[in-house]
């Protein structure tokens, strides 16, 4: 039986274990994010990253979210890092004042990531790029959980065409 899983925060070890348990001829599809807009945002950030020396990720979620930063924010930072051969040149932790450690965000593969948890959000993320004289902001907002359904349906329809472990909705978006 093919399987479609949507959750956040699975470790690489857990993914390897899942890949090992997937029976031959079946597909285990894991999506850290089912919103097509969020997947496109990550792809756009990956494309922009080589052209900007500074990049930061800001993610906003409801106050009951169990992980910080979100899996989407972590993956975005990884994609930015992979697509360029430099870390952000934005001021780092050395600029944090005493008593405000963490104000510059968590560094994930050289990219500062900031997590905000508050009532009123479902899920939002923006990636801010900077270079001399310009900034580029790429933002995605989910205001309602119905935004996940097109990606869920795409995953369900596409899982029949794959074998083994497939990670990420972008693998099915043409």
PLM regions with names:
Residues 27-28, 32, 37, 53-59:
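Conserved beta-loop-beta element that borders a ligand/cofactor-binding pocket
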Residues 53-174:
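C-terminal substrate-binding/catalytic lobe of Rossmann-fold NAD(P)-dependent oxidoreductases
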Residues 8-10, 33-35, 62-63:
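Short, ordered loop/turn segments at secondary-structure junctions
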Residues 36-43, 75, 151:
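Short amphipathic alpha-helical face segments that pack within enzyme cores
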Residues 1-2, 23-32, 96-108:
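Short charge-dense sequence patches
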Residues 1-4, 139-141:
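Well-ordered, non-transmembrane segments within structured domains
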Residues 22-30, 131-138:
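Glycine/charged-rich beta-loop-alpha catalytic/anionic-binding loops adjacent to active sites
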């Amino acid at each position: 039986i093919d399987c479609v899983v949507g959750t956040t925060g699975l470790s690489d070890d857990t993914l390897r274990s899942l890949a090992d348990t997937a029976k031959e001829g079946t597909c285990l599809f894991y999506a850290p994010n089912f919103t097509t807009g969020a997947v496109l945002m990550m792809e756009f950030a990956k494309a922009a990253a080589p052209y900007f020396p500074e990049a930061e990720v800001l993610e906003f979620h409801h106050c009951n979210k169990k992980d910080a930063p979100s899996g989407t924010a972590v993956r975005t930072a990884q994609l930015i890092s992979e697509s360029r051969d430099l870390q952000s040149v934005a001021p780092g932790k050395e600029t944090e004042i005493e008593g405000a450690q963490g104000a510059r965000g968590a560094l994930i593969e050289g990219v500062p990531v900031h997590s905000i948890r508050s009532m009123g959000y479902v899920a939002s993320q923006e990636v801010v790029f900077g270079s001399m004289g310009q900034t580029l902001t790429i933002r995605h907002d989910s205001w309602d959980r119905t935004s996940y359904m097109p990606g869920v349906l795409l995953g369900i329809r596409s899982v029949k065409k794959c074998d083994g472990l497939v990670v990420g909705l972008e693998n099915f978006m043409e």
